[in-house]
């Protein structure tokens, strides 16, 4: 739902 640093969340 939101890419922080790896591409997840």
UniProtKB/Swiss-Prot annotation:
Keyword flag Metal-binding: yes
Keywords carried by this UniProt record: Calcium, Carbohydrate metabolism, Glycosidase, Hydrolase, Metal-binding
Taxonomic superkingdom: Eukaryota
Coiled coil: none
Record EC number: 3.2.1.1
Cofactor: how bound: Binds 3 Ca(2+) ions per subunit.
Molecular functions (GO terms): alpha-amylase activity; metal ion binding
Named cofactor requirement(s): Ca(2+)
Catalytic activity: Endohydrolysis of (1->4)-alpha-D-glucosidic linkages in polysaccharides containing three or more (1->4)-alpha-linked D-glucose units
Stated family: Belongs to the glycosyl hydrolase 13 family.
Subunit structure: Monomer.
Protein name, entry field: Alpha-amylase 4
Source organism per UniProt: Capsicum chinense
Taxonomic lineage of the native organism: Eukaryota, Viridiplantae, Streptophyta, Embryophyta, Tracheophyta
